[in-house]
Amino acid sequence: MLLDTASLYFRAYFGVPDSVKAPDGTPVNAVRGLLDFIDRLVKDHRPEHLVACMDADWRPHWRVELIPSYKAHRVAEERPAGPDAEEVPDTLSPQVPVIEAVLDALGIARVGVAGYEADDVIGTYTARATGPVDIVTGDRDLYQLVDDARGVRVLYPVKGVGTLNLVDEAALREKYGVDGAGYADLALLRGDPSDGLPGVPGIGEKTAAKLLAEFGDLAGIQAAVDDPKARLTPTQRKRLTEAGPYLAVAPKVVRVAADVPLPDTGTALPHGPRDAAALEALAARWGLGGSLQRLLTTLTA
């Protein structure tokens, strides 16, 4: 089981009231919400392996070089020497180090790789997996990894982190008209304002799905642009031609990496805390109470 950690603690932050606080009055709603969510995941699915995948770089330079608008609207501060600072709510930022410390003390593998997003870490673990994979994320970008034949599915939280939608190929075909392999092509054609991806002007989700159904994939659509007999309207042909420079680079930006140099880290689900003393201190300092105890009880069951 692979957790898209940042997307989940964002969901927890907005789904749990900020009246949930540590003894000193510091909000810990994201911390406790995430712990409660992991507890439910482990109870319901009992994964053999669990990895909290992290954004070591939420906006990698190699993606920005190709599409400068990529996530540009979410930059709080540009940092030439390292990853740009991301806009994060003031009361969430201080909770992230607490989340990391608690995961480490629990013994839950926490993996981020310099120069890559959590999506890329997830993509690489998925590519290497020899058995079924559940990807838990609030980011639809990872729908591209869904693969029934390999047992790869997405568990997508709705209503904060209270409910999970199971996304398999049937769900993708019903909602988007594509399978997992086609989702990245659909996304780059249609664009995604939340990630600063412009898409092809005038090609929305339904048109993109129709083009993929007709021509198979992005390469097939691009070949059709140069084929006067292909069933494209003059407007579609014009728009796709004008978007040629974008379409040449967008796949590398949109498709998650599958070749990240992952660390040699144990990923087995822990059955007891790695550092009980550190965990006890964190629980007392941050008032993690029932949330942490419930998760510990579940892990040791």
UniProtKB/Swiss-Prot annotation:
Q: Which residues form the signal peptide?
A: none
GO molecular function terms listed in the Swiss-Prot or TrEMBL record? 5'-3' exonuclease activity; 5'-flap endonuclease activity; DNA binding
The record's listing under SUPFAM superfamilies reads:
5' to 3' exonuclease, C-terminal subdomain (SSF47807), PIN domain-like (SSF88723)
UniProt domain 5'-3' exonuclease: residue ranges: 182-264
Q: What is its EC number?
A: 3.1.11.-
Question: Would you kindly state one Gene Ontology biological process term found in this protein's UniProt entry?
Answer: DNA replication, Okazaki fragment processing
Q: Name one Pfam family in it.
A: 5_3_exonuc_N
Q: Which UniProt keywords apply?
A: DNA-binding, Exonuclease, Hydrolase, Nuclease
PANTHER family per record: 5'-3' EXONUCLEASE FAMILY PROTEIN, FLAP ENDONUCLEASE XNI
Protein task: 5'-3' exonuclease acting preferentially on double-stranded DNA.
Q: What is this protein called?
A: 5'-3' exonuclease
